[in-house]
């Protein structure tokens, strides 16, 4: 594992920790715009770091050239570096990131809550798989 991947993993871990710290029990999330911004920004950062890692591995191992951020995870799954379910979940995160970054549509806070409560472990699972390589 090289410094690029090590640094990206550190970013993901830091962002997950920050999300967990600021989100707390979630009782204030829908009323607190600053809290929403913090959680969404850190989800974006997690997603970007995962994309960067995937692109780096795709390039290093010459797995192909992704045509989109989602394709980065597809290539990893096609080459059995991550599972298809993990690839699918990370591709959904890219969709959430795209909505948050580009304002394609209003971000549904219920989806953000669901991600925080049920899918932060997708980032952790991705880290574990990458570290095992």
UniProtKB/Swiss-Prot annotation:
Changes after translation: Tri-AMPylated by cognate antitoxin MntA on Tyr-104; this rotates the residue nearly 180 degrees. Modified protein has much less RNase activity.
Highest taxon listed in the record's lineage: Bacteria
Motif interval(s): RX(4)HXY motif: 97-104
UniProt GO cellular component terms: toxin-antitoxin complex
GO molecular-function term, one example from the UniProt record: RNA nuclease activity
Primary role: Toxic component of a type VII toxin-antitoxin (TA) system. A bacteriostatic toxin; upon overexpression in situ or in E.coli inhibits cell growth. Cells swell slightly. Neutralized by cognate antitoxin MntA. Cleaves mRNA in a probably endonucleolytic manner; has no activity on rRNA, tRNA, ssDNA or dsDNA. The TA system confers plasmid stability in E.coli. Neutralization is mostly due to tri-AMPylation by MntA.
Protein name per the record: mRNA nuclease HepT
């Amino acid at each position: 594992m090289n410094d690029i991947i090590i640094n990206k993993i550190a970013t993901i871990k830091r962002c997950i920790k920050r999300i967990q710290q600021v989100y707390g029990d979630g009782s204030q999330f829908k009323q607190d715009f600053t809290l929403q911004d913090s959680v969404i920004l850190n989800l974006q950062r997690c997603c970007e770091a995962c994309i960067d890692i995937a692109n780096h591995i795709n390039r290093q191992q010459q797995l192909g050239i992704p045509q989109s951020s989602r394709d980065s995870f597809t290539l990893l799954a096609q080459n059995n570096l991550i599972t298809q379910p993990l690839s699918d979940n990370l591709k959904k995160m890219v969709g959430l990131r795209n909505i948050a970054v580009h304002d394609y549509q209003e971000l549904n806070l219920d989806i953000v809550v669901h991600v925080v409560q049920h899918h932060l472990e997708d980032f952790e699972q991705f880290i574990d798989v990458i570290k095992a390589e």
